[in-house]
Amino acid sequence: MVKSVADRFFLGLDFGSTRIGVARNCGSLAVPVGVLPRASCAEILGYISRYSIDEVVIGLPLTLAGKEKQSARLAKEFSRFLVSSGVQVRFFDERFTTVIATQKFYSLGKGVKQIRKCVDAAAATVMLQLFLDMEVKVDPLERKP
């Protein structure tokens, strides 16, 4: 039996220049998990095990024209590591997720130093929420007659 989106567990990863933002879902809601240094393969595998993750959603950095940024290469390299570890991986366009997360923090009156500490996890949360929202729209198990 195929699980609906709300019954599956996803881990969202947003690759920043030095850190990886991590988010997971609780049903159809994305929640932040934290921020890791970019070379944290073992920790991410630990999250996958701890949260019984069915699939990892990796944010793919794209330009406004839809072309891959240089950092997309790093995301793809990391995806190959996950796949070789038996993890199911999917890419998702992460354009503007950091901008959206940063604007939310500014609207809450947060300063630059506060934002810098958690913006990667917030961007991963925004990206994963967008992914979940799109999946629910196309998931036939989620549709009501």
Swiss-Prot record:
Broad EC category: hydrolase
Record-stated family: Belongs to the YqgF nuclease family.
GO biological process entries: rRNA 5'-end processing
Keywords assigned by UniProt, alphabetized: Cytoplasm, Hydrolase, Nuclease, Ribosome biogenesis
Pfam families xref list: RuvX
Cross-referenced NCBIfam families: RNAse_H_YqgF (TIGR00250)
Name of the protein this chain belongs to: Putative pre-16S rRNA nuclease
